[in-house]
Amino acid sequence: MKKVLTLTALSTLLLSTSAMAAGFHLREQSAAAQGNAFAGATAGAENGSYAYYNAAGLTRQKGLQVNLGATYIAPRATAKNVMSENGTRGADVENVVHAAVSPNGTVSYQLNDRAFAAIAVNSPFGMITKYDRDWIGSDHGITSDLKSGTITPMFAYKATDKLSLGAGVQMQYVWAHLTSSHNYSRTGLVTENGNDFDMGYQLGAMYEFSDATRVGVGYRSKIDHKLKGKMKSSGSALITSDNPDYAGAGMQANALMNQKISAKLTTPAMLSMGVYHDINEKWAVMAEYQRVFWSSFQNLTFVGDRLNKPTGNIAQVKENWRDTNFYSIGTSYMLDNQWKLRLGLAYDQSAVRYAHRTPRIPDSDRIWYSMGLGYQYNENLSFDMGYTYIKAHSAKMNSAVTKNEGSHVSADYSNSVKVFAFSVNYAF
């Protein structure tokens, strides 16, 4: 009997994230930057929403300004050629990843000629996935729902006429809801819920070579979460006295699986560098590089409080994620005094290599194609719209290669996503 119960819990949060962004990061925090595929996001500072990428850019926001936005993420993920470990062919799975809305907002205020403050609200990590209850890989996950909310007070200071510095405190809440079937017989349902609050920081710098050219560097720290919650099980009893890994004779599944649980989840550190240049009064070009330190996510250990094992581990999944690179280039063009056109192209590297790709994380590299519009309604009020089509490379997955516990399942994944972003900015 396999000793793992299918409680690879938080791994199923990451199911089919290849259709959205590398890992489970939601890069989409600015409608204006969306139009340029986030090229120059750490140097652009067109409005307060750019402070998510670099707090130092606040020194370009004069007076009191409010930016409110939302991003609608509409992914499409399909699993084909689904096979079980005994060679049984499963049905293709359509629309695994569900659409979601990621809100964002920033209020910035100029304290004096050199000091600036702001508070930002973002949802930087999250996703929703749902498989059919009877799909072949149901023990690897059925429903996965991850939500996050981050409030970041920020401060920026114009150290010289050319150099600006910024910093912020990330206060982050994470909530997760997951379901899967028992991996012994795939009868019954396991439900896990957990949440946590923890803190991190962000740092930034911006240097303006001239009125036309500037560069920026931004860093967001990792945040180590320990999600705590409950696990509940419904269905037939599956644990018997001949299983030495669990508590003594006669222990039943419901007795073992209705318990308190915890799991560690780290949201990764990110380092970004960007450049922005005005070629003339109408035309600007920009570029961005971002390093996401996903290597902090090597193993996922899920701990329960009713095991007779020394560690209390219900399951340990080897993730072995790698650090990733994101590259983007973009351009903007003023069509007239009110309308601005934005274009961008990006390459987004996957955190998961083939040897570690699982049904929970069929991630792959992707290309971003972006465009957007900015509209200056009057001196105080402006609007931004962004659209991105993301095409992920095809991803072959065979869980037997990963050597993790649980049933074996293989599939070919095809993923894409459409992203629509809108924001309004008002300067008082």
Cite the ranges covered by each PLM segment.
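Gram-negative bacterial Sec-dependent N-terminal signal peptides
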Residues: 1-21
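A general structural signal for short secondary-structure junctions and capping/turn motifs
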Residues: 12-14, 58, 107, 208
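Hydrophobic alpha-helical membrane context
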Residues: 14-15, 66, 396
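Outer-membrane beta-barrel porins/channels
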Residues: 22-37, 41, 84-92, 99-428
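Transmembrane beta-strand segments of Gram-negative outer membrane beta-barrel proteins
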Residues: 24-40, 59-78
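A common structural microfeature
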Residues: 33, 48-49, 63-74, 102-104, ...
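Outer-membrane beta-barrel pore proteins
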Residues: 41-46, 51-64, 107-111
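Glycine-rich loop at the start of a catalytic domain that most often binds anionic cofactors/ligands
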Residues: 63, 81-86
